[in-house]
A protein has these predicted regions:
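Feature of Fe-S/electron-transfer and energy-metabolism proteins
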Residues: 1-369
Length: 369
């Protein structure tokens, strides 16, 4: 707020308190008591190492986990595709380039629950046969980078990362790559190009990264929340995990509510939760007159208030409505703000952030602006 600039400079202005809480019947992602210590990490790793890899894949597929970064592709199927590639060198990549305005779920997990994310990477590497992983973390998240590096160092010290993990003969290590500030790097092929030191441009698919990804080798790319959810599945069991949700979309989802809510913050909810419940009961209603919500980032779609009354938080409902769930960031558009001006802003954003490779985006975003 420009009117409070003097207060901010003087350090007298305080931002509204943000809440982190789970509203799920089976909390995991924001619940430290379930899985948060290095002993938890070791114990669950030992259980997984004693289980056949095909059984682990079957459990992951049975859980119904789908990518939490936007596309919603079945995670178990992605890992299985990569595992089946008969190539000696494979990679695991964590997409932590959280660039959607209003989204901070990935940042929360990396700074408050890093072991859940790192466990997902280690067990993915074990299943697909990878020896090297990369965490591509948004450059604007210095604390996330520091905490992740500290956690990696501790895992190496405890023998939970590096050579011969837990005496199993399994070797795996990972490194942090600092993002370069481009929104397009949130797209998996552009992210891969950035890790390789190339210009961050999207690649034509197929081949998909699970067949030909980083350095032209089979690669699993998952976002932060997807990897953290893997730890939940192997900790709670696939039956318990898939019992959460509405039968179509399973498990829990982190949502980010902005400052137009009376209770702004980050919350864990069951997929299938009515948006009206999120607004009224979790968010405490709005503190201003709102005309619409931008959910899932600048490309996720604008949801009018009247549609919110019947919409549920799940992949199918959003797809049927022509929206994209994405990171499930809730950005409010007040009635006092012109919808035309907001649309212009979105086109300007996409025109600025487009990598320029594909002409519909390169030309369309500029014309829209």
């Amino acid at each position: 707020d420009i009117n409070k600039l003097d207060q901010i400079i003087a350090g007298k202005h305080t931002s509204p308190a943000y809440t982190m809480k789970s509203f799920s019947n089976t909390p995991f992602l924001v619940e430290e008591s379930v899985f948060s210590t290095y002993d938890d990490f070791k114990d669950l790793l030992e259980v997984c190492f004693a289980t056949d890899k095909d059984d682990l894949i079957a459990s992951l597929k049975d859980s119904g986990l789908r990518g939490r970064g936007g596309a919603g592709f079945p995670t178990g199927m992605k890992w299985e595709f990569c595992k089946d590639q008969e190539v000696s060198t494979k990679y695991v990549v964590c997409n932590a380039d959280e660039g959607d305005p209003g989204a901070f779920s990935d940042r929360y997990l990396m700074e408050e629950q890093p072991l859940k994310v790192l466990f997902g990477m280690v067990i993915c590497a074990y299943i697909i046969g990878s020896k090297q992983g990369f965490l591509y973390i948004r450059g604007e998240y210095p604390e996330s980078i520091t905490i992740t590096n500290d956690s990696l160092a501790k895992l190496r010290e405890l023998g939970l990362l590096g050579d011969n993990i837990l005496g199993t003969g399994f070797d795996f290590d990972m490194n942090v790559v600092e993002g370069q500030g481009a929104y397009i790097c949130g797209e998996e092929t552009a992210l891969i190009a950035s890790i390789e030191g190339r210009r961050a441009e999207v690649d034509v698919r197929p081949p998909f990264p699970v067949v030909e990804g980083l350095y032209k080798k089979p690669t699993v790319v998952n976002n932060v929340e997807s990897l953290a959810a893997v730890a939940a599945i192997f900790k709670l069991g696939s039956e318990a995990y898939k019992s959460i949700g509405n039968g179509r979309s399973l498990g829990t989802k982190l949502i980010s509510l902005d400052g137009y809510f009376n209770n702004p913050g980050l919350y864990e909810v069951d997929l299938g939760t009515p948006i009206s419940f999120i607004i009224d009961e979790i968010g405490g209603g709005f503190n201003d007159d709102i005309k619409a919500l931008q959910i899932g980032g600048p490309l996720g779609g604008i949801v009018p208030v009247d549609i919110l009354k019947t919409l549920t938080l799940d992949f199918e409902a959003f797809s049927e409505g022509g929206f994209l769930l994405g990171h499930a960031s809730f950005v409010c558009i007040p009635k006092s703000f012109s919808a035309v001006e907001y649309a212009k802003h979105l086109f300007a954003f996409t025109a600025h952030e487009s990598c320029g490779k594909c002409f519909p985006c390169r030309l369309g975003s500029v014309r829209g602006k």
